[in-house]
């Protein structure tokens, strides 16, 4: 019988991961035990993926509010600091902000509008239109924002982030002034010491600030890049990709992940004889069409992966072939013709026959699949096993 199933993505249950656990052994054992219990076999070019959260937990990669405060104070002077373009998230930024506030005397908090970088709205575009506000040029004080738009709560969490962040800063004994603007250089009218908290546009923000005369400029990726009093750290991403662990501690994005994925690949090869690709994944980079949230608060989808996951898909669009090249064929004759075209394909970059085949990196595509499979709550499946991803219609 012809094969009837293509790509399969399985969430693999494993023990709760604690600091110091052997994640290589746990991952390999869990994947092989799942395969044995469900009656399927490992194959060459399967993909095993591990969520960044359990990697960081096993590493013990944590930082406290006091650690963050100490680093902010050392790098930005401890006086008045402009904190610009943070995302609106209790999980992703609130504990970091508590540490930042503890390391300053005053924060000028500059929020982007109508939404943050990943789509959390402070106001709607319709509200801006009605108020005749130009988000590209207009700078709003807190008073003007409240006068025009009142209280705006997040549609899902019902949090008024302007009030929430202001209260959090004051709780740390730090003064706060709130403005809304979208040009990072506006902050230099208030202070020359700036912590730019954007994620994917951070390099440009830093460049513009330095060119405009800022004295001290850091991004979140410059805070917690080395241990503070024995804390965790991430030399490449700092606080980027961190999230709440407790009320006074964050879990940092994992480090040294390449050694992990290569070790998992080697153990799977030793125990199964199969060459399996391995990656660590975080946010899946998909966008919610209703809430308008871009699921990429991490600096990258995958901080590490085996070499076989480098590149982009090289695929033909079956419906294009069926509707154009082989429009006069049907049934077995059409199937044979399409299989022949697939077997004969070369590099399809720029080819009309490949249009609509999602030109994204493999790690980003597979990371989306993994994040959607594992979820972010109580499924208990931080390991994903994907089979058939690299197969096509001929396999």
Range-by-range predicted roles:
Residues 1-44, 53-395:
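Conserved mixed alpha/beta catalytic, RNA-binding, or beta-rich assembly cores of soluble enzyme
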């Amino acid at each position: 019988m012809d094969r009837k199933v293509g790509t399969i993505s399985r969430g693999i249950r494993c023990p709760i991961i604690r600091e110091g656990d052997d994640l290589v052994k746990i991952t390999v054992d869990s994947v092989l035990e799942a395969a044995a219990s469900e009656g399927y076999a490992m194959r060459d070019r399967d993909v095993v993926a591990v969520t960044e959260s359990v990697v960081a937990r096993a590493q013990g990669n944590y930082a406290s509010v006091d650690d963050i405060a100490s680093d902010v104070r050392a790098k930005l002077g401890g006086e008045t600091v402009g904190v610009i373009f943070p995302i609106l998230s209790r999980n992703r930024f609130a504990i970091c902000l508590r540490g930042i506030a503890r390391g300053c005397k005053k924060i000028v908090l500059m929020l982007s509008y109508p939404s943050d970088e990943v789509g959390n709205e402070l106001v709607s575009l319709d509200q801006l239109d009605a108020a005749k506000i130009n988000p590209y040029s207009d700078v709003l004080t807190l008073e003007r924002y409240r006068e025009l738009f009142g209280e705006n709560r997040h549609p899902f969490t019902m949090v008024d982030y302007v009030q929430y962040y202001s209260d959090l800063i004051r709780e740390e004994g730090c003064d706060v002034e709130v403005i809304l603007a979208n040009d990072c250089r506006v902050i230099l009218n208030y202070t020359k010491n700036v912590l730019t908290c954007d994620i994917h546009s951070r390099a440009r923000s830093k460049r513009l600030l330095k060119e405009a005369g800022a004295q001290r400029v850091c991004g979140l990726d410059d805070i917690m890049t080395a241990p503070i009093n024995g804390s965790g750290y991430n030399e490449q991403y700092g606080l980027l990709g961190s999230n709440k662990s407790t009320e006074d501690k964050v879990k940092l994005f994992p480090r040294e992940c390449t050694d992990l994925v290569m070790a998992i690949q080697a153990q799977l090869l030793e125990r199964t004889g199969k060459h399996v690709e391995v990656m660590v994944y975080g946010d899946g980079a998909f966008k919610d069409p209703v809430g308008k949230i871009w699921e990429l608060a991490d600096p990258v989808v995958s901080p590490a992966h085996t070499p076989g996951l480098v590149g982009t898909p090289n695929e033909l669009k079956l419906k294009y072939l069926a509707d154009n090249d082989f429009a006069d064929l049907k049934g077995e004759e059409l199937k044979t013709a399409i299989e022949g075209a697939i077997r004969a394909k070369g590099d399809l970059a720029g080819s009309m026959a490949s249009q609509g085949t999602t030109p994204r990196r493999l790690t980003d595509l597979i990371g989306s699949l993994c994040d959607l499979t594992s979820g972010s709550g109580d499924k208990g499946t931080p390991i994903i096993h994907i089979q058939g991803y690299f197969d096509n219609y001929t396999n």
